[in-house]
Structures are given as structure tokens and as C-alpha cells.
């Protein structure tokens, strides 16, 4: 137990105690603005809010004073213009302060990360596991596993618990007090992990970096114990497959697990012995897979329930943890339906004058495209109806024909690009058909003609031109031993940039 406490003890010698004054430094907001322009995170122009992108300490000070005075919260129901104006100001306050919070709150973690590797050689494959390690895991090791534990990370976390966890890293009371006030003030505008609605979409979009940081910090708290178990037990040594995704790593801080491990710790470690245990996560969903027995997975499930209950004061619902056998169930992860299927084959073995026929079943990874959810997403975006019948896109009829073709082509290429790792690409033909015919109907509606006459006048080449690019890219990657069409439909190609288009369901 003492060894565990020494491991969980923080190195407080490098903590920065004074972060509140940084809120009034103009360069902090310049960094936030540059980050929005260079890190490929959507950043709306401040001209929308009648603001000229010039930050100053005086403006920030006024915003903080107004927040504390709460004058902007007095909304008159009879005055709709006053209500719109106050909501407009609330958006401006939240965006400016959250941008400052996002930059400042990352400083202690960034300093600790840099200082921890001073004079040391960084082992990138171990310490900076990313989503890219998931692809070789699926191809090389996933087929040898038997059971999988689907985990939905617990949410929503209470805002006070989130601030208390940050207190272990940041000791500036003024900064934490303002952060607590800010979170409580705007928690109705956006939840850290729940689905986005129309009324909080603006808040999430304009403050994405800040809330991604808070969400990643919460996720780190929920899975940090795996770091300790991996270091203490050689049974959890699969570092190439233990991938803490989202690249947000905070080292050295784990505490309050004494309640879970209040008994003999070595005995508890023995309960989780498994030489083939793997853990990986993407966003709010994580997977634990094992070659062991269902009893072992049940032990891990009970452990996670106790961890969430004692550490996060969260009562876990039964639907957040599912134990499935890979041979009988599909794994819904990264937008794919993955499963392990035995692939029987016959081998003829010749030994001197005797010949033997051996039946061998080799496990094969199947990654299937979820067609029904994709069609539902297309229907939600008004590309087709719920039965998959293509319809025109009325919202795009005011655009030029070239822009319409480019939009449809970009969506179609993104779908092909994202699901290039599928083992059955022919299932995407229905999605491509919906997009092609929807594009044709939109163009025909734009020119006030029928689809038949439009296709007869222009031909079908204009529908093919935005589908060729993806096939050309694959033709350069794959060997040219066989026909390109057969090759493209059978080969799995994992692109490292698919997380950029993981919001594939948001096609509008």
C-alpha cells in the first residue's frame, strides 16, 4: 500500500501558483487566436459578434466584473431585443474567457510534460500512444482475442468534482474560483460530454478547445489507474496496444484510489492476471479486450464500477458496460462494425510417402460498414428519405452547379476515404448511389428540368469525376498485380487522418 501511495504522490515542486494574472495578458489571447487559425479547429470570425479580434486586458477585466455582478443575466421577457442582446453578450463572455482559460490551464501540464523529459530520450511509441496504434492492433492482435468489454466513460461529472481534481494541479485559488464560477454560470449552455443540441451548439463550437481539455482531463482521471497497473504487472505489458488517445497525457497524478485498494494490493493484482489484456479508447468510448475467460472480464467490470462509484461518486448504469464474445458479436468502434470470424482452409501435408489433409481455421478480421446508420444520417441531412430513396438538396439549389458537384463529391470521397479500412467495400455502392442521384436531382431542380433530361444533356461523366480521386490514390498505394477494381474492393487501407472526418454523420 505504501508503494502505491508513493507512486500516486505528485511532484508539487514545479507547480505554478499564480495563473489568475495571466487572464489579463494580451498575448494569452493572441496565442488562443493563433491556435484557432493554425490547429485546424473551427474558429469563427469575431466579426459575427461585432468584435474586431483585438483583445485587451481592460476588456477582459470588464467582462469578469460583469460576470460577478450578473447584470447581464437580468432578462426582460417583454423585451425581445434586450433578450437577444444579453444572449449575444453571454456568447461573447463565454468565448473570450474560455479562450483564456484554455491557454492558461494547459500551462502547468505542458511545463510538467516538458520537464519530465529533460535529459531523457522520449520513447514515442510508448509514451505518446495515439489513434494510429489502433490500426496495427486491429490487424495484428485483435484476431487472437476472445472477449471484449465495451465501456462508455462515465458522465456527466459534477462540476465541483472537476474543479477539485484541477486543484491537485493548480493552486491559484483566485483562478480556480473564477473557473468554478464560469462553469456553473454556463453549464446549461453546454454539457461536457452530452450530445450537442441547437441551443448549446454555438457554445461548444466557439469554446471547443477549452471543453476538450476539460473532457480529456476527466477521461485521464477515469483511466489513469491503468498506467499504474501496467507498470506494476508484467501481465499488462502490451504497450503498443495500450493507446491513450487524444494525445492529452498528464503524468504523475493519481490519488484517492486507496478506497478501491484498501485490502491486500498484491492479491487484487493477482485477480487481473492476463497476458493478453489490451485497452484502447477513442473519445468517450473505450474498449478492453482479452484472451482470457468471461470470469476475468466480469472482475474488470466490477472493478470499474467500484472505481467510478468511489472516485467519481457516480452510480454506473448497466448499459455502460457490456461483455461480448468476439466470435458472436460485432464491435462498434470508430464507425466500423468489427468482428473475428474463423476462415477455414485445407492444408495438404506430405511426410515421406504419407500425405495428410489438415483442416485449419484461421481467425480473420471483418470490418463492415454500418450501412443502416449511414443511410439514417443521410436522411437526417436531407439527401434521402428513411428508406434510402435519394432526394434533392433544396438548401443547395441557390449555389452554382460547380459548387453543388464539389460538395457532393467531397462528401462521397470522405465516405470512401474513411471506410477504406472495410473488408467489404462493395457495401458502399448504395451510399455512393444515393449521393450520385441526390446530386443529379439537386442539379436538375436548380435548372428546372427533369433528372432524365438533365443526364441526357450532360451525360454521366460529371457524376464520375468526383469519385475517381479516391481510386487513383489507392491505385498508387496498392501493388498492380491484379485488376484494380478487384484489388480496391478487397484490400483494407487505413488512413491516419480519418479522425479529421470522424464527424461523418454530420454531413450538412
Curated annotation (Swiss-Prot):
Molecular functions (GO terms): RNA binding
InterPro entries the UniProt entry points to: Domain_X, Maturase_MatK, Maturase_MatK_N
Compartments, as annotated in UniProt: Plastid, Chloroplast
UniProt keyword annotation of Phosphoprotein present: no
GO CC, any one term: chloroplast
Keyword entries, A-Z: Chloroplast, mRNA processing, Plastid, RNA-binding, tRNA processing
Principal location: plastid
Biological process (GO), any one: tRNA processing
Family the UniProt entry places it in: Belongs to the intron maturase 2 family. MatK subfamily.
HAMAP family: MatK (MF_01390)
Protein name: Maturase K
Natural source organism: Ranunculus trichophyllus
Name of the gene: matK
Amino acid at each position: 500500500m505504501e508503494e502505491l501511495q508513493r507512486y500516486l504522490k505528485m511532484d508539487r515542486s514545479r507547480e505554478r501558483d499564480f495563473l489568475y494574472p495571466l487572464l489579463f495578458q494580451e498575448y494569452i489571447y493572441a496565442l488562443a487566436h493563433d491556435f484557432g487559425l493554425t490547429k485546424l479547429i473551427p474558429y469563427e470570425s469575431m466579426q459575427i459578434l461585432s468584435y474586431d479580434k483585438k483583445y485587451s486586458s481592460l476588456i477582459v477585466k470588464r467582462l469578469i466584473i460583469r460576470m460577478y455582478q450578473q447584470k447581464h443575466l437580468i432578462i426582460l421577457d417583454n423585451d425581445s431585443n434586450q433578450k437577444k442582446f444579453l444572449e449575444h453578450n453571454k456568447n461573447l463572455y463565454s468565448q473570450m474567457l474560455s479562450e483564456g482559460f484554455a491557454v492558461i490551464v494547459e500551462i502547468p501540464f505542458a511545463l510538467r510534460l516538458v520537464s519530465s523529459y529533460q535529459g531523457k530520450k522520449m520513447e514515442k511509441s510508448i509514451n505518446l500512444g495515439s489513434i494510429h496504434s489502433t490500426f496495427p492492433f486491429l490487424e495484428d492482435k485483435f484476431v487472437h482475442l476472445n472477449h471484449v468489454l465495451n465501456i462508455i466513460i462515465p458522465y456527466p461529472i459534477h462540476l465541483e468534482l472537476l474543479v477539485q481534481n484541477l486543484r491537485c494541479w493548480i493552486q491559484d485559488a483566485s483562478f480556480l474560483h473564477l473557473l468554478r464560477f464560469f462553469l456553473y454560470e454556463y453549464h446549461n449552455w453546454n454539457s461536457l460530454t452530452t450530445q450537442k443540441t441547437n441551443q448549446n451548439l454555438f457554445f461548444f463550437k466557439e469554446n471547443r478547445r477549452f471543453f476538450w481539455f476539460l473532457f480529456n482531463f476527466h477521461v485521464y482521471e477515469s483511466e489513469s489507474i491503468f498506467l499504474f497497473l501496467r507498470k506494476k504487472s508484467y501481465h499488462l505489458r502490451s504497450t503498443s496496444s495500450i493507446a491513450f488517445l487524444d494525445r492529452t497525457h498528464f503524468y504523475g497524478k493519481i490519488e484517492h484510489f486507496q478506497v478501491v485498494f484498501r485490502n491486500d494490493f498484491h492479491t487484487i493484482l493477482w485477480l487481473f492476471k492476463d497476458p493478453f489484456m489490451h485497452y484502447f479508447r477513442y473519445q468517450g468510448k473505450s474498449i478492453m479486450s482479452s484472451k482470457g475467460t468471461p470470469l476475468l472480464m466480469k472482475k474488470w467490470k466490477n472493478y470499474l464500477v467500484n472505481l467510478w462509484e468511489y472516485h467519481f461518486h457516480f452510480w454506473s448504469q448497466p448499459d455502460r458496460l457490456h461483455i461480448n464474445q468476439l466470435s458472436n458479436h460485432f464491435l462498434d468502434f470508430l464507425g466500423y462494425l468489427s468482428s473475428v470470424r474463423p476462415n477455414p482452409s485445407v492444408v495438404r501435408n506430405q511426410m515421406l510417402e504419407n500425405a495428410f489433409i489438415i483442416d485449419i481455421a484461421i481467425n480473420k478480421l471483418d470490418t463492415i460498414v454500418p450501412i443502416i446508420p449511414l443511410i439514417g444520417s443521410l436522411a437526417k441531412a436531407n439527401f434521402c428519405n428513411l428508406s434510402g430513396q435519394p432526394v434533392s438538396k433544396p438548401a443547395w439549389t441557390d449555389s452554382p452547379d460547380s459548387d453543388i458537384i464539389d460538395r457532393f463529391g467531397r462528401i462521397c470521397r470522405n465516405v470512401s476515404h474513411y471506410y477504406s479500412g472495410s473488408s467489404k467495400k462493395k457495401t458502399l455502392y448504395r451510399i455512393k448511389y444515393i449521393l450520385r442521384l441526390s446530386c443529379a436531382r439537386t442539379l436538375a431542380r436548380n435548372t428546372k428540368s427533369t433528372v432524365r433530361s438533365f443526364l441526357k444533356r450532360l451525360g454521366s461523366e460529371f457524376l464520375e469525376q468526383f469519385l475517381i480521386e479516391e481510386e487513383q490514390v489507392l491505385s498508387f498505394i496498392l501493388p498492380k498485380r491484379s485488376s484494380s477494381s478487384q484489388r480496391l474492393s478487397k484490400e483494407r487501407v487505413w488512413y491516419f487522418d480519418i479522425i479529421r472526418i470522424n464527424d461523418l454523420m454530420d454531413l450538412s
